[in-house]
């Protein structure tokens, strides 16, 4: 299989440390969620940002492939760190909340959102591993 892209990130210090990418485009302190101060981030925020961006790209592509124009999709991804009844360590769950302009029906929007979920590399990577809630609102 062909590799389309590869990147590296290095962390020193775990959840109370620092992370940077090989090109230094990302170079930021890491803190536990309870210690967030606006100057540092945490793994959950980084995951939410990456997944939201990837998913919205997939959603936009699916809409365009199906000749839906001017939908202007927006995706907000909520990441939760929650108790895991099967383990002592917590687990992640996510909600994907998409909004598009009123250019298609709610039913069509839900169909295309599901197609985006099947296409998105983050969704594929997490499939069967975390609970994912999918929601879409069609707005004026």
Swiss-Prot record:
NCBIfam families: organ_hyd_perox. This is Organic hydroperoxide resistance protein-like. It comes from Staphylococcus aureus (strain NCTC 8325 / PS 47). Transmembrane segments: none annotated. SUPFAM superfamilies: OsmC-like. Belongs to the OsmC/Ohr family. InterPro entries: KH_dom-like_a/b (IPR015946), OHR (IPR019953), OsmC/Ohr_fam (IPR003718), OsmC/Ohrsf (IPR036102). It holds the Pfam family OsmC. Signal peptide: none annotated. GO terms for biological process: response to oxidative stress.
